[in-house]
Amino acid sequence: MLLVLLIIIISLPIKISKEKPIINTINTIFNNKNGKTKVIDPIGKLEIPKINLTKYLYDQNSSLNNIEENVTILKETISKNENGLMILAAHSGDSDKAFFNDLDKLTIGDHINLKYKGKEYPYIVTNIFEQEKKGYINLDIKDESQLFLTTCSKAPHKQLIIETKKIVLTP
């Protein structure tokens, strides 16, 4: 019986989509519709040691900068100054794309590392709060470098927001 089952499983056809990217490698390889391979390099990497999260970030104009595939740089909120404001969003829940599912485990004082366009930016969590889901979030923008992370809260109709500020390293 087991041998018959193994033969059936082994003989099942496997469908591999050539249009689906291989995501979160150092370079993302994309096979487009005309069969040509396109390599998309990430522009950054988000690391949150406490929740064992490491995810690559892609240019705002890249097709890979979307919440269905990756941690996303929100287009309306990133400053042209790399040392300014950045807001990142990702799904939470039980999907394999729920990259921010454990964001609620962060506490004030936790560290987040952002590598962006060849520079490293260490951040520390300064505030954690929730807002009603309205399709936008209200943020307290300060006169300092800030990184915000946002996802759906585990509470119904709420948005979880993690506010951080850049750690200024003295030489």
Where are these regions (language model features)?
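Solvent-exposed, non-transmembrane regions of membrane-associated and secreted proteins
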Residues: 2-171
